[in-house]
Amino acid sequence: MRTSLLVAALGLALAAALPGGAPLAQPDPEATMDRSLLQRQDLPYRFSAVDLDSVDGQRHYRLWLGRPLQAPPAAGYPVVWMLDGNAAVGALDESTLRRLADGDAPLLVAIGYRTPLRIDRAGRTFDYTPASPGQADQRDPLNGLPSGGADAFLDLLRDGMRPAVAAQAPLDTARQTLWGHSYGGLLVLHALFTRPGEFARYAAASPSLWWRDGAILGERAGLEQRLRGKRAELLLWRGSAEPASPRGSLKAEPGQAMARLVDDLRRVAGLTLDFQPLDGLGHGETLGASLRLLLARPAVERQR
């Protein structure tokens, strides 16, 4: 009952932001990936690439692996999986990598697409959005592109990407983090709500709570049962200058939906939640800011 009330309340908050108002700034569709860090040999990380395709052969991935120079721990490297990998690589910098190397350095896996572009709009629209039950034609409500491939993507990450990465470097599968921004943040919440044991830490920056009128909020029902006997950590970020939706207005109390979700999730046994508002940041700016904040944290610990 509580979850139903939460979904209804958040739906009203999201609906208030939909009509009119200033649109959310969209990323430049022609912006190219910043690859400068990948070629450098003076850093404590070395980057390589692994290519694979979706099961249906329609999407073509390039995984950028950032491996620390130091030897792995006995159990393998902790792993940070980064969605929108082409953009994530561009958000990394020298100081972040050097700081990581001074501690329990994780293996970085940026899940990108084989394109020179920073963002693969069609790929992420399909891969990062949950299926809508009862709809024969799954189309994204914002851009009209095919959507609904989230579970196929998460299955591929588990059954295809993870073994491919493990063939290149030893992984500690008990210390995995999944990070995503915007639609990627939506996928992170979907992964937490539907398969909470597959990662130890879930990190969602500016998740698209508005998507399909807040459909992701309905997936939260039953999380306590799915999480029983397990533990998970959720990190959430949101910029104070973000509207509530792509067509929303800053006057529509844009942080209300996130605040209510945070309040609800704090009550879930076994889930550790940390919400950090990012003062003054807009939607696009939270991508790099959240990733750097995530990587400034110690690697996720093994469950005891």
UniProtKB/Swiss-Prot annotation:
Main location: periplasm
Catalytic activity: Fe(III)-enterobactin + 3 H2O + H(+) = Fe(III)-[N-(2,3-dihydroxybenzoyl)-L-serine] + 2 N-(2,3-dihydroxybenzoyl)-L-serine; Fe(III)-enterobactin + H2O = Fe(III)-[N-(2,3-dihydroxybenzoyl)-L-serine]3 + H(+); Fe(III)-[N-(2,3-dihydroxybenzoyl)-L-serine]3 + H2O + H(+) = Fe(III)-[N-(2,3-dihydroxybenzoyl)-L-serine]2 + N-(2,3-dihydroxybenzoyl)-L-serine; Fe(III)-[N-(2,3-dihydroxybenzoyl)-L-serine]2 + H2O + H(+) = Fe(III)-[N-(2,3-dihydroxybenzoyl)-L-serine] + N-(2,3-dihydroxybenzoyl)-L-serine
GO molecular function: carboxylic ester hydrolase activity; hydrolase activity, acting on ester bonds
Active site: S182, E242, H283
Cellular component annotations (GO), alphabetically ordered: periplasmic space
Loss of function: phenotype: Deletion of the gene strongly inhibits Fe uptake via enterobactin.
Record EC number: 3.1.1.108
Cellular location(s): Periplasm
Signal peptide: 1-25
Gene3D superfamilies: alpha/beta hydrolase (3.40.50.1820)
Coiled coil: none
Keywords: Hydrolase, Periplasm, Serine esterase, Signal
Oligomer and partners: Monomer.
Recorded family membership: Belongs to the esterase D family.
Protein name from the UniProt record: Iron(III) enterobactin esterase
Species of origin: Pseudomonas aeruginosa (strain ATCC 15692 / DSM 22644 / CIP 104116 / JCM 14847 / LMG 12228 / 1C / PRS 101 / PAO1)
Organismal lineage: Bacteria, Pseudomonadati, Pseudomonadota, Gammaproteobacteria, Pseudomonadales
Annotated gene: pfeE
